[in-house]
Amino acid sequence: MSTNAELFDRACRSIPGGVNSPVRAFRSVGGTPRFIQRAQGPYVWDAEGKQYIDYVGSWGPAILGHAHPEVVRAVQEAAVHGLSFGAPTEAEVELAEMLIARLPSLEQVRLVSSGTEATMTAIRLARGATGRHKIIKFEGCYHGHSDSLLVKAGSGLLTFGNPSSAGVPPEFVAHTLPLEFNNLAAVDAAFSQHGAEIACVIVEPVAGNMNLIKPAEGFLAGLRELCTRHGAVLIFDEVMTGFRVGPQGVQGLTGVRPDLTTLAKVIGGGMPVGAFGGRADLMAHITPLGGVYQAGTLSGNPVAVAAGLATMRLIGEPGFYERLSAQTARLAQGLQERARAAGVPFSADAIGGMFGLYFGDRVPASFAEVSACDTEAFKRFFHAMLERGIHFAPSAFEAGFVSATHDDAVIDATLEAAEQVFATLRA
């Protein structure tokens, strides 16, 4: 049996940095990444056979817990009939219909294979439909790794302390206006200066890639009003929050309806599925109907769609989100109470099945505030919890995720471990 360290050393010889997505490398927390061999329910097991309670959840998709038997069965049954056809299937139509039925802002939707594809194409669609070039995004919000969006981004870029990426020509981001999240006045000023040039505003309606930052009261409604007034397209990037925070995503919780929505993660049930959709008049600009090009060999892949359909059916059961939200809130509140009892500066927040942990005196409301949190304290907390069998994201700038299988016993075990760790942090 190989150890995690041996596997990481081997991986580094053939894969850049030893990983296929940078945050997995543990660079921001130090130490050796855990190589996962299997997962079931709320647990993962590493290459050395150690079991962990998992709050990474494949970075969001595992809302039902890992390897849910009905999802696994759906994948197996689909795979028997073929892995990929490069042609339309009834299943992809069914998934599209299901997404439209669940999200009132969707009139039409197209399936892709990732969140990056979804956001990249939504931006292209907004530009093509409006004939404008400039876009507004927000500092710390991550919308995938397409060139024009790698400006003051969150997720891996924030983890590594890089506000943008090498290899992106200045011309590619010349039309991107990065503004402060939750600062509606800055958006108003940008529209006052560039209104006739702005194609769209893209936003994580709850930011989950600079830890968890909720929208300020009136922020999303204000974006809706400004986009309507200036003829710009409002895009909600619900790749992370879609069907994770509630049955209709953030737009269902707030009542703010975007023009376009991007989705991924949960809708694939752990398989590579993304989607973008919205107003039919906008979607009519996508090929083969219009002149905005988009294509994909594996878009609507039948095996991935089978996982998505099974997941979407299960999360649609009555009471699902009430139970998920209650467990997530219990975890966040329990962690905050134990930190406070230990005298450790710490805050926690939650929405639906997502939570944020911050080593600071209050819950941050912006990129600047989350950047000021104590990352060294987080590193100590992360490793001490990992030693006790609790698997949090290896970055102070990533949200955490609870699944339907995180029952009271799992939450209690997590809080017991955290109580021990907070006592050591105080010392």
UniProtKB/Swiss-Prot annotation:
Alphabetical list of SUPFAM superfamilies matching this protein: PLP-dependent transferases
GO function term, MF aspect, one: pyridoxal phosphate binding
GO cellular component, one term: cytoplasm
Gene Ontology biological-process entries: protoporphyrinogen IX biosynthetic process
InterPro entries hit by this protein: 4pyrrol_synth_GluAld_NH2Trfase (IPR004639), Aminotrans_3 (IPR005814), Aminotrans_3_PPA_site (IPR049704), PyrdxlP-dep_Trfase (IPR015424), PyrdxlP-dep_Trfase_major (IPR015421), PyrdxlP-dep_Trfase_small (IPR015422)
Cofactor(s) this protein cannot do without: pyridoxal 5'-phosphate
Reactions the enzyme catalyzes: (S)-4-amino-5-oxopentanoate = 5-aminolevulinate
Biological pathway: Porphyrin-containing compound metabolism; protoporphyrin-IX biosynthesis; 5-aminolevulinate from L-glutamyl-tRNA(Glu): step 2/2
Compartments where found: Cytoplasm
HAMAP family: HemL_aminotrans_3
Family classification: Belongs to the class-III pyridoxal-phosphate-dependent aminotransferase family. HemL subfamily.
Subunit: Homodimer.
Name recorded for this polypeptide: Glutamate-1-semialdehyde 2,1-aminomutase
Source species of the chain: Bordetella parapertussis (strain 12822 / ATCC BAA-587 / NCTC 13253)
Phylogenetic classification of the source organism: Bacteria, Pseudomonadati, Pseudomonadota, Betaproteobacteria, Burkholderiales
